Amino acid sequence: MTNYRVESSSGRAARKMRLALMGPAFIAAIGYIDPGNFATNIQAGASFGYQLLWVVVWANLMAMLIQILSAKLGIATGKNLAEQIRDHYPRPVVWFYWVQAEIIAMATDLAEFIGAAIGFKLILGVSLLQGAVLTGIATFLILMLQRRGQKPLEKVIGGLLLFVAAAYIVELIFSQPNLAQLGKGMVIPSLPTSEAVFLAAGVLGATIMPHVIYLHSSLTQHLHGGSRQQRYSATKWDVAIAMTIAGFVNLVMMATAAAAFHFSGHTGVADLDEAYLTLQPLLSHAAATVFGLSLVAAGLSSTVVGTLAGQVVMQGFIRFHIPLWVRRTVTMLPSFIVILMGLDPTRILVMSQVLLSFGIALALVPLLIFTSDSKLMGDLVNSKRVKQTGWVIVVLVVALNIWLLVGTALGL
């Protein structure tokens, strides 16, 4: 009886510790369902039905492994990826990495900020510029939570992630997809045209986020409680749950677009405004409203995450710190410029996701090198299978990007 109580008590303690360590992956996961995903997934689903769902499945599995490696680096070394690059690489390489990481972070924030502004425009009937102002105010308010520590921010962003997931369950019910075709699209690879390759690269860029690779290692580098192995075990659960939710949202997003638009003849829907307006007569006003609300939630939470990632990148690479409100103000400017110039916001969203896909390999290569170094990682060093899988992911990403560049240059 005594042994049972001891085991029960230790089991409760282990569960309590796992719960206490939950959260960092939810902040990372929100980057995987930002408005860039909305734009790319809607275009892919409307244009090609269920044919590109397999890209989402494999990209999400890759993302799970990548985020586990990023989190593991922080746990094992007490330093984030940017700091490790700074400590191990020559200064010119470090400065190159910092510049490209800042560009990637700003491209990400552009997509997220404009996406939230579009969401406000759709559900409130305001102008895009007014939506951008509302987005700026809302993100400043959310960032103020950082003053109270990481946990309050994790709870708010985790709540927004769950809201977006719930919203897309509702959208799935409204759209009534063909489950047999949906399942086929998830498991059978298909890239029927050069446009499909372009969108596949965009889906990859929208699903595997370079800036979140840097951020996640910083969120776990100061975790406390239990042994390193226990913290790593809890982190794997954290990543598995958060990334499964994010992957589900991306799948449902593309499947909903396929069911609602592609199979009703609206294959040219490539604009978030058009998607919202088309949903109203096809499904219902409620479905369109849920779409708008989920876009706002995804945009607000992911633009906050983008701001945090930019801060980590700057501090890690060049040891320079600026207040979060200053960074938020500066990174809002490109979004306002795009809006004031009257550029197509949805096209900007998709292009930003393609740009992101070029930053994945640059973040992945050092991540794999560091996490495969037994001197750095100790007992958390990568296994041979993980190393091999990681390099396969790098090769796939680079190959897809080369295919995209050649196809674009030749006008294929």
Swiss-Prot record:
The chain crosses the membrane at residues 20-39, 52-71, 96-118, 126-145, 156-175, 197-220, 239-258, 277-297, 328-344, 351-370, 388-406. Residues 40-51, 119-125, 176-196, 259-276, 345-350, 407-412 are periplasmic. Signal peptide: none annotated. Residues 1-19, 72-95, 146-155, 221-238, 298-327, 371-387 are cytoplasmic. One of its GO terms (cellular component) is plasma membrane. It is a multi-pass membrane protein. One of its GO terms (molecular function) is metal ion binding. It comes from the Bacteria. It holds the Pfam family Nramp. It is found in: Cell inner membrane. Keywords: Cell inner membrane, Cell membrane, Ion transport, Membrane, Symport, Transmembrane, Transmembrane helix, Transport. Coiled coil: none annotated. InterPro entries: NRAMP_fam. HAMAP family: NRAMP. H(+)-stimulated, divalent metal cation uptake system. Belongs to the NRAMP family. This is Divalent metal cation transporter MntH. The gene is mntH.
